[in-house]
């Protein structure tokens, strides 16, 4: 990752290495001063699958209940509007994007969190930062706690000292027999999920 970058030579963008860029805060600031409405404080993009293809992760919708169809639909509309502004910004302010165009967008909005079960074990941020080990481990993860503030603002990143275990008990609801739950609704605190939800635990 590259943070707080003001300029990267164009030839670096064309390198075939896999990489993620997080930064260009000054460009965001200048664009906002020029009237751009950008939902994040940083420019975020990563190499795609094809040469000269970049994936952008800059849309944000906060403070909605994604279990409510009306709010979810409104969020999809907001994301579409944000995407248009983000493309305009990239072409005007980021070196190498001058002739960029949109090839495709995600078919639906990515939701980081809605409901979580209360399982036989609740994984916490203490487990993550203490690199917890469990006898019933089913996955190992190590991504930082990538906290996107639900009511607005940017995100915070808290690094894990090492990998941690996710126990099987996080998948077993306390009060329902015969059910195993996987994905973003497993038994974890908000902060623990901010790490474990990110691809890909092994």
Sequence positions of predicted segments:
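A conserved FAD-binding loop/helix module that cradles the flavin
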Residues: 190-202
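Mobile, glycine/GP-rich and aromatic-enriched active-site lid/loop segments adjacent to catalytic centers
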Residues: 1-181, 186-189
């Amino acid at each position: 990752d590259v943070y707080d970058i003001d300029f990267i030579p164009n030839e670096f963008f064309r390198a075939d290495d896999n990489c993620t860029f997080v930064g260009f805060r000054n460009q965001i600031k200048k664009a906002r001063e020029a009237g751009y409405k950008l939902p994040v404080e940083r420019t975020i993009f990563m190499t795609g699958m094809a040469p000269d293809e970049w994936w952008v992760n800059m849309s944000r919708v906060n403070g909605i209940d994604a279990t409510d169809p009306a709010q979810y639909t409104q969020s999809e509309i907001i994301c579409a509007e944000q995407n248009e502004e983000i493309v305009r910004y990239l072409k005007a302010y980021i070196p190498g994007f001058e002739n960029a165009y949109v090839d495709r967008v995600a078919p639906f909005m990515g939701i980081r969190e809605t409901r979580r079960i209360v399982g036989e074990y609740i994984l916490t941020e203490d487990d993550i930062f203490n690199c917890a080990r469990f006898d019933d481990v089913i996955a190992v993860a190590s991504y930082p706690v990538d906290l996107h503030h639900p009511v607005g603002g940017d995100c915070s990143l808290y690094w894990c000292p090492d990998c941690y275990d996710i126990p099987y008990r996080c998948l077993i609801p306390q009060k329902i027999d015969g059910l195993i739950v996987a994905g973003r609704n497993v038994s974890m605190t908000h902060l623990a999920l901010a790490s474990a939800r990110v691809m890909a635990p092994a």
